[in-house]
């Protein structure tokens, strides 16, 4: 299948078993996701982003295998989601999917526009209402009450799913990663090796991603992981600047 649009459309429901879907270009595994695929009696659609594969010939392998017709679209339809019954009106909820721990909370005032925005990232499965496919979702607010969901900023890769962490506004550019007028934002997160097919037989490690556009998008640091595995289930880095020590300090959960 040649990718011509931004998203693949997967019909899903809550009443079938999870299937593994692998994406290959020739013999190279590009990604793997886990969804409740249901083309017989679907409840709604999910949209898998494939714009980065545009023009490529992608093989999509389903486990267990079923016959399926693939649809592509440039315009996801989430118009129904905020009208569904029982959705909370006060607490933040994602348009679709499963979410958990808030991560990397920070406030930032743009050096260019002067606009102050509160940023909240969170553990997020954009493809289903159960744990899995863990990304960092993103929402913003100007008053801490009204939140708007933005595009996810980190997706699973060959180091693993993207587990919890923290964010630092590097206003002094101690990292040297700043480019442009805005302060560079650093995210420290756990790459959960062994939690997806791409990261088979790898261990949990700690990684960095950085943003030069006020936290809207992030680039994964090319030297990741910055801390190798230091023990079973080491995860959830919290990083702060310690003025007395004149250095950053990281706390990790260890089991």
Question: How does the language model describe each region?
Answer:
Residues 2-237, 241-255:
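Beta-rich carbohydrate-recognition and catalytic domains
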